[in-house]
Amino acid sequence: MNTTFSITPLGDNAVMIEWEQRIDPNIHQQVMKAFHYLQSLKLSYITDLIPAYASLAVLYDAAGIRQKIKRPARAWISAFITRTLQQTPDTVATASRSLQIPVCYHPSLAPDLSAMAQQKGISETDLITLHTAQTYTVYMLGFLPGFPYIGKVDDQLASPRLKQPRTQVPAGSVGIAGEQTGIYPLSSPGGWNIIGQTPIRLFDPAAKDPCYCRPGDQVQFVPVTLETFYQMQQPS
């Protein structure tokens, strides 16, 4: 795999592996290869792995490393990661899933759809077509539990955040900010351009796997009617 990365401290019990800092599916593929390979080793010293756009946070048991390996924890884990990733084969599976997420683009659920279409000089139908035409990658989860950062949208859809964020955005709202699209798993304040809403519950703390989306997932948005939306809607 691509060994052009750096490792920097992230507090007392973590380090950050960083690749070139930009939104790029090839770079994210390297992140996910590192994530899955380190995860497959099932080392007790590594307590968590958190992938993002172009980085991977590695949380580790510093006390356990010092006690059992008799070496400074950060130096040992950094050397271990460097050595391991340099030897990681390019054939490592990234175990991505394909998800079809229903979205209703009805005006009652899409407060920014009309204004955004006017700003872009296209019809609302064309905007919806552009948003649903491609398969996206979930690059990371963040901001809220289970909030998927998904990209990249068609250049015609790229839009800045709202100048005045809303104090409340409903759970399931689908938005666009910059080159990204995302889904609010919970009701919260937010400044993304809301163009629709999904009936799917994206975060369930009582579930075995609380987050509906995972980094590396391949996502396609499927338009549904308002009637279908309410038939499918799951309690949040």
What kind of region is each of these model predictions?
Residues 2-236:
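Glycine-rich active-site loops that engage anionic ligands at enzyme catalytic sites
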